């Protein structure tokens, strides 16, 4: 019987935690290394929010408009196929993060609230007050802890 390879993830910020979760969900075993305790990684400083064209305010936003804003905002220097993929994936990622427990701001009706941010033409930025990065980091760390309890992840912090 072949053993499952152990995968090393270096970095306990949002990208490292997301990679760790994805690998663990696929059945892999992960050693996660972070030079600081995960909840002190620099991702905690991200404040603005995450853009996704969910069009909950009925403004006519779309993934194509999101793509156009992103390419234009980057002075047309971005590699456009990955930008298109990112814009198409963004609404589903917001939904996933919401299900993971990120306390995004809500409208009085209980829907996700979106605002304009960073030069966007539409209200497409999902946010958690002024602590979006911290809330994302804490929610993803809780998911990693769940996989730690299952024995799929071993975390090495402050090494």
Q: Which residues fall in each region the model found?
A:
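Conserved N-terminal/central alpha/beta ligand/cofactor-binding core
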Residues: 35-159
């Amino acid at each position: 019987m072949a053993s499952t390879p152990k995968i090393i993830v270096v970095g306990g910020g949002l990208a490292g935690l997301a990679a760790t979760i994805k690998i663990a969900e696929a059945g892999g075993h992960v050693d996660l290394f972070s030079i600081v305790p995960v909840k002190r990684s620099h991702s905690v400083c991200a404040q603005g929010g995450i853009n996704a064209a969910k069009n909950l305010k009925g403004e006519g936003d779309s993934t194509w408009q999101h793509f156009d804003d992103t390419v234009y905002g980057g002075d047309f220097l971005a590699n456009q196929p990955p930008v298109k993929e990112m814009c198409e994936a963004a609404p589903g990622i917001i939904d996933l993060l919401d299900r993971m427990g990120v306390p995004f701001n809500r409208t009085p009706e209980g829907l996700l609230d979106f605002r304009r941010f960073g030069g966007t033409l539409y209200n497409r930025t999902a946010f958690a007050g002024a602590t979006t990065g911290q809330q994302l980091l804490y929610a993803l760390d809780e998911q990693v802890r769940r996989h730690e309890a299952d024995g799929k992840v071993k975390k090495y912090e402050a090494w």
